């Protein structure tokens, strides 16, 4: 039997696994339990009423959170010419074509998001086996393959989150840091839920958002009472 640590025991005693918490109450609880020596992220798991085995019911997209994620995002852009200048002005950290691809092939990947203009996909396409498994491959469905690379860079820097359901129909993403206040986390979560509802597949029937849980990087999940969010979603 696995040993129960002091931290796990505290979490078990504090979190009622049978209860759905008010969003504000949940945030207070997460802050109380966040005792790691770094500022933990606040992550969300959203169970969707979809059949993930059916391709037409899979959900994928991106949205900019009103208060960002609290992370300093490094952005790499594959583009050239006027788009390269626009990306630089927008705040891109790395810009290039074949030269940038060579860095990636060598394992030099000091970035969190990759954006590409359509004409650059001939170069980026060669990097699929490297970028794909890391979730970094640009995709038009989430706005990272676009002729407007400057806006994509701004979105990434502003706190855009990308989401995609897993094989169990669950969305996992971040909505901020534990040092955000409750109002900021609530507004970020509601913004994500609005985007998700807009992404609901037409073939998905019944309740779409079935369960929402939030947790910190090192903490347990706390189930939310959706009634405390209904005004916005």
Curated annotation (Swiss-Prot):
Keywords: Repressor, Ribonucleoprotein, Ribosomal protein, RNA-binding, rRNA-binding, Translation regulation, tRNA-binding. This is Large ribosomal subunit protein uL1. Coiled coil: none annotated. The gene is rplA. The keyword Ribonucleoprotein applies. One of its GO terms (cellular component) is cytosolic large ribosomal subunit. NCBIfam families: rplA_bact. One of its GO terms (molecular function) is tRNA binding. The lineage of its organism: Bacteria, Pseudomonadati, Pseudomonadota, Gammaproteobacteria, Vibrionales. GO terms for biological process: regulation of translation; translation. Binds directly to 23S rRNA. The L1 stalk is quite mobile in the ribosome, and is involved in E site tRNA release. HAMAP family: Ribosomal_uL1_B (MF_01318_B). The keyword Transit peptide does not apply. It comes from Photobacterium profundum (strain SS9). InterPro entries: Ribosom_uL1_bac-type, Ribosomal_uL1, Ribosomal_uL1-like, Ribosomal_uL1/biogenesis, Ribosomal_uL1_3-a/b-sand, Ribosomal_uL1_CS.
């Amino acid at each position: 039997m696995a040993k129960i640590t002091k931290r796990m025991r505290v979490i078990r005693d504090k979190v009622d696994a049978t209860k759905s918490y008010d969003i504000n109450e949940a945030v207070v609880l997460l802050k109380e339990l966040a005792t790691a020596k770094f500022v933990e992220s606040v992550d969300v798991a959203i169970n969707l009423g979809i059949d993930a085995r059916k391709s037409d019911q899979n959900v994928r997209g991106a949205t900019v959170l009103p208060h960002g994620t609290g992370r300093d995002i490094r952005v790499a852009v594959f583009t050239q010419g006027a788009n390269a200048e626009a990306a630089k002005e927008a705040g891109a950290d790395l810009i290039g074509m074949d030269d940038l691809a060579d860095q990636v092939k060598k394992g030099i990947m000091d970035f969190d998001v990759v954006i590409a203009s359509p004409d650059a996909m001939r170069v980026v396409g060669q990097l699929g086996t490297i970028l794909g498994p890391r979730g970094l491959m640009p995709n038009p469905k989430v706005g990272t393959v676009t002729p407007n690379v400057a806006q994509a860079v701004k979105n990434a820097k502003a706190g855009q989150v990308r989401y995609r359901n897993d094989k169990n129909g669950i969305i996992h993403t971040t909505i901020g840091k534990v040092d955000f206040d409750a109002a900021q986390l609530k507004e970020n979560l509601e913004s994500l839920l609005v985007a998700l509802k807009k992404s609901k597949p037409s073939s998905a029937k019944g309740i779409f958002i079935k369960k929402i849980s939030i947790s910190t990087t090192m903490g347990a999940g706390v189930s939310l009472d959706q009634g405390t969010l209904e005004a916005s979603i």
